[in-house]
Amino acid sequence: MAFTSPLSTWSLGQQFGLALVISALALVSVIIYGCFLHPLRHIPGPFLAKFSPLWIMRALHRMRFNSELQALHQQYGNVVRIGPNEVSFASLEAETAIYAKQEDGRFSKAGTFLTLFSDLVLNAPTLITIPDPILHRKLHKVIQQAFTPQALARQEPIQKLHIDMAMSELEELAKSGGTVDIADTLETMFWEIIGDLAFGEPLMSGKRPTYESLKQLGKSTMPMVEALSFFLTLPGIASVFGIARSLITALPFPSQLSKLVPSSKLRDCAERQDGREDFLTAIMGSEKQDLVLDADAFFSNAMGLTLAGYQTTATTLAATFYHILRYPEAYNRVCFEIRSTFVSDEEITGARLGRLPFLNACIRETLRLLPPANGKTAQRTASSCTIDGVHIPAGTTVSADLYTIQRSPKYFADPAAFRPERWLDVAEDSEFKRDNRAAYRPFLIGSRACIGREMAQQSIRLIFGNLLWKYDFQQLDQDGFVWERDAGSSLIYTDYKVMVHVMKASGRS
């Protein structure tokens, strides 16, 4: 006698009702486990974060990750659970514990959001995402050759060449009294610079619009990647990764990325290298450390370094310009410092700009307010440990929220305001005398700190030095765009504009 399921006698409505009941019971079970039984149940945080990735997905979708995470820390304190298996810290002690000793095996890049995103978009791990500390140390050692003081000195003429070329547009605007989005101008300028520094020739020249379209596409996929990273932590779900890769590969992102620098052109470029210490020749030196990089790893590292370096530096350029234009006293002071130091633009060098106290104070203050390495890029996977007095189970994703730390009244006076004078020598009675400068770590610390930070700061100084020596700028409609209110933040900053009126500086021909 054949077995007949009782469900076969049920109506479609009854079967649907049963499915709803089972789903509801499963959801209640997940909520109960996340809130009352999970190893992280002792850590406070929003209700949704206790059992789902929905809080993070919403913050990424709204493009308000930094400000909303800061609000959580203000509500719950220095330790906040922002996902079922994710904890954010907002203290200097936690930041030091997580990032200072990367090679001891306690904190890994494996399984983090950035590593997953990179794995889905690129075909091989990069210096930025590679989990293995030994391989990372070897790769870091060879790529570091592109960022030594000697290499930076040899790169300066290339930076100056592209700055001079880009200033022709500003020259025409200054003559006609025109207006421009200076953020867009600065980013285009640096795109050409880093493309040349990376590959030994302007291999990406004119392709910034392609990248910008990719950035918008990437912005829309962030919540989906967050959901995927959550599901991959569940038992038996790892096989989904291959399916997810296939689905995301079907999107325009990977194919468009290859259009920025086709692999065939990259190989041609590598064969034409003339000994310049750029990103490409540094990566080619990997064999000196017994590292053999296949074509995918070669391409992924070249593109990963270039795009990461471009986006963080371009944002800092735009944000620094934005801040000094909003504060006339700061703008006038930095212009006076530059114009009184250099008689002609030929005297402007990276070394001399590095000695200008107020210019560098403006850059540092911008990096304090808007650290480029913040958000999901700073995640690590922890072993069983104690961070800032809180027990963290093995496998927990942890990060220190630089945005909140560097805006904390615990470490800085008047923390939300742009006050570059805090970085100058301060008097005993100064309100900034008690600032804890050790809490300023915009490029992170330890072996995973940004490898290109000196190159980035040299480019920023050269661009500002040349532009402010020759031109005056006036921001239009200051209330039309407010960075904290209008710029998007997730993995990167997006959707910012700085509209200015361009004029020749007094006495400049």
From Swiss-Prot:
Family the UniProt entry places it in: Belongs to the cytochrome P450 family.
Pathway: Secondary metabolite biosynthesis
A GO cellular component annotation in the UniProt record: membrane
EC numbers, comma separated: 1.-.-.-
Summary of the function given for this chain in its UniProt record: Cytochrome P450 monooxygenase; part of the gene cluster that mediates the biosynthesis of the mycotoxin fusaproliferin (FUP) that belongs to the class of bicyclic sesterterpenoids.
Keyword GTP-binding: no
Keyword Oxidoreductase assigned: yes
Membrane topology: Multi-pass membrane protein
Protein's recorded name: Cytochrome P450 monooxygenase FUP2
EC primary class: oxidoreductase
Applied biotechnology: Fusaproliferin shows cytotoxicity against pancreatic cancer cell lines and provides a new chemical scaffold that can be further developed to obtain more potent synthetic agents against pancreatic cancer. Fusaproliferin and its analogs show also anti-inflammatory activity and can be hit compounds for the treatment of inflammation-associated diseases.
Binding-site positions, heme: C450
Organism annotation: Fusarium proliferatum (strain ET1) (Orchid endophyte fungus)
GO MF annotation list: heme binding; iron ion binding; monooxygenase activity; oxidoreductase activity, acting on paired donors, with incorporation or reduction of molecular oxygen
Compartmental location: Membrane
Names of the cofactor(s): heme
Listed InterPro entries: Cyt_P450, Cyt_P450_E_grp-I, Cyt_P450_sf, Cytochrome_P450_monoxygenase
Pfam family for this entry, one: p450
UniProt keyword list: Heme, Iron, Membrane, Metal-binding, Monooxygenase, Oxidoreductase, Transmembrane, Transmembrane helix
Membrane-spanning intervals of the chain: 16-36, 224-244
